[in-house]
């Protein structure tokens, strides 16, 4: 039995939004501030995870610094973000899917606060 599609769930970072560069830059900055080794490839490898798991994977040697490192990362990300950028064609595609009556959702490791901030910047709160 074939059922019509009613809901589409999208990944966020690196799928809908071109935010990978800013995430990596902010993680590298935070690591440097706390004298922790980190490569760009390692930073890229955790995109999509929640921040607690990011800290556990990237900085297992200093669990006592996880909170401070993540705070530094978040502050750098917000301060240096010029606004996340939809990949080409994504905004039109999402609007078309909504107009066709489909429900859209996001699965992300980004915090709800962070997701809401970006959606508000893009005036896209009603898409998801």
State what each model feature region is.
Residues 1-44, 59:
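Active-site neighborhood of HAD-like aspartate-dependent phosphohydrolases
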Residues 37, 125-128:
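Conserved H-loop
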Residues 58, 121-125:
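Short, hinge-like loop/turn segments at secondary-structure boundaries
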Residues 47-78, 96-98:
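A metal-dependent, Asp-based hydrolase signature
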Residues 22, 50-53, 64, 92, ...:
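Short alpha-helical
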Residues 46-50, 88-89, 110, 123:
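Short beta->alpha linker loops
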Residues 4, 79-106, 112-119:
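Short, acidic loop-to-helix structural element flanking the phosphoryl-transfer center
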